[in-house]
């Protein structure tokens, strides 16, 4: 089902920090029979495309400090961040989506940004929604003014 596929893609992405990690991570899923070679190749291509989007390139560089599936306690709830990255060019917050764009995703990411700014002394954070489909679609999420 699309939902199961979305959960599975998130699981795989949580194990990948750089493009170099992607191949090994995907191989392990092929070995255990979770995905076939074609799916692995398609996911590898997808990840390479995401990592090469100009506004995201720093967030996938070897020098980045990457935290995947980070849990943050904020306003009486636990927020789970898909990918939080610190680089010499600032911080990145990336949320992966496998479905259709929705306005509520922007609201959710703004809440994540508020939480991270609380923790990190108002550090500048660039936030992006990354839609993974046949096409890679990236939307920057702006803070509320």
Please provide the spans of the model-predicted regions.
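Mg2+/Mn2+-dependent nuclease catalytic core
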Residues: 75-144
């Amino acid at each position: 089902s699309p939902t199961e596929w979305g959960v599975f893609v998130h699981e795989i992405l949580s194990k990948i920090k750089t493009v170099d990690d992607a191949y090994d991570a995907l191989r392990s899923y092929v070995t255990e029979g979770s995905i076939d070679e074609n799916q692995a190749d398609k996911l590898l291509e997808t990840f390479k495309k995401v990592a090469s989007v100009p506004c995201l390139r720093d967030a996938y560089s070897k020098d980045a400090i990457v935290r995947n599936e980070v849990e943050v306690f904020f306003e009486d709830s636990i927020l789970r961040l898909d990918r939080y990255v610190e680089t010499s060019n600032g911080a990145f917050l990336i949320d992966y989506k496998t479905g259709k764009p929705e306005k509520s995703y922007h609201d959710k990411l703004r809440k994540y940004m508020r939480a991270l700014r609380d923790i990190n002394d108002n550090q500048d954070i660039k936030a992006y929604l990354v839609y993974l489909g046949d096409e890679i679609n990236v939307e920057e999420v702006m803070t509320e003014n």
